[in-house]
Amino acid sequence: MNKISPEAEKVRNALLSKGIETPMITPEQDRDTRRAGIEQHMREVMKLIGLDLRDDSLEETPVRLAKMFVDEIFSGLDYANFPKITNIENRMKVSEMVLVNDVTLTSTCEHHFVTIDGMVSVAYYPKKWVIGLSKINRIVAFFAQRPQVQERLTEQILLAFQTILETDDVAVYVKATHFCVKCRGIKDTNSYTVTSAFGGVFLDDRETRKEFLTLINK
């Protein structure tokens, strides 16, 4: 396993302490070994559902799935992939709300391994630190790139920013479509799920919370 950054370690410990870390283990194998193992098992799965892997459209699918699982859609299970974060001292004494709206969210439902597709809004009131705006998108993407439930994902994003920015004054709002509802089971193509998490002034002050919700829904 690759070494993880101090920021990643702080965030992971915070999630573990609060009991909202994703249920996961640390694999003993390196990435190549894991990809090979997944490929082998996916070949068996595809055969069991009745697919002919001799077809040129299917023969490389197990390889593609293994690479996708390890290197892409579940890469957030490895804290070595946590975004590089450099806190910037708040020398300008920014005291107004910083809001990043409509951050693209693509995750995977941990119950059925199908897509969760939506948008995230993140806001905070700076104290000692600010961070680059793109880092907000990257942190959201990191926690999305793992099997998830939306409620836990929302809380993880909140606590990650509270930990990195060293402030409780953070708000997170997630609106997403779950393809486990859309393409199977009830097959509801219209519904979406909204979750939110508030800390500090967003939790304690109704007007601040109202301002945030008004801004993100304009």
Swiss-Prot record:
- Source organism superkingdom: Bacteria
User: Known Gene3D superfamilies for this protein?
Assistant: 1.10.286.10, 3.30.1130.10
Assigned keywords, A-Z:
GTP-binding, Hydrolase, Metal-binding, Nucleotide-binding, One-carbon metabolism, Zinc
Q: What is the enzyme's class at the highest EC level?
A: hydrolase
- Residues given in the record as Zn(2+) binding sites: C109, H112, C180
- CDD domains reported in the protein's UniProt record: GTP_cyclohydro1
A single GO BP: tetrahydrobiopterin biosynthetic process
Would I find Cell membrane among this entry's keywords? Answer: no
The EC code for this enzyme is 3.5.4.16
The metabolic or biological pathway listed in the UniProt record of this protein is: Cofactor biosynthesis; 7,8-dihydroneopterin triphosphate biosynthesis; 7,8-dihydroneopterin triphosphate from GTP: step 1/1
Q: Does the keyword Nucleotide-binding apply?
A: yes
| Cited InterPro entries | GTP-CH-I_C/QueF, GTP-CH-I_N, GTP_CycHdrlase_I, GTP_CycHdrlase_I_CS, GTP_CycHdrlase_I_dom
PROSITE patterns in the cross-refs:
GTP_CYCLOHYDROL_1_1, GTP_CYCLOHYDROL_1_2
Residue ranges spanning the membrane: these are none
A GO CC term attached to the entry: cytoplasm
Q: Which reaction does it catalyse?
A: GTP + H2O = 7,8-dihydroneopterin 3'-triphosphate + formate + H(+)
Return the Pfam families for the record.
GTP_cyclohydroI
Q: Name one GO molecular function term.
A: GTP cyclohydrolase I activity
Q: Which family does it belong to?
A: Belongs to the GTP cyclohydrolase I family.
Q: How does it assemble?
A: Toroid-shaped homodecamer, composed of two pentamers of five dimers.
What is the protein name stated in its UniProt record?
GTP cyclohydrolase 1
Source species: Pasteurella multocida (strain Pm70)
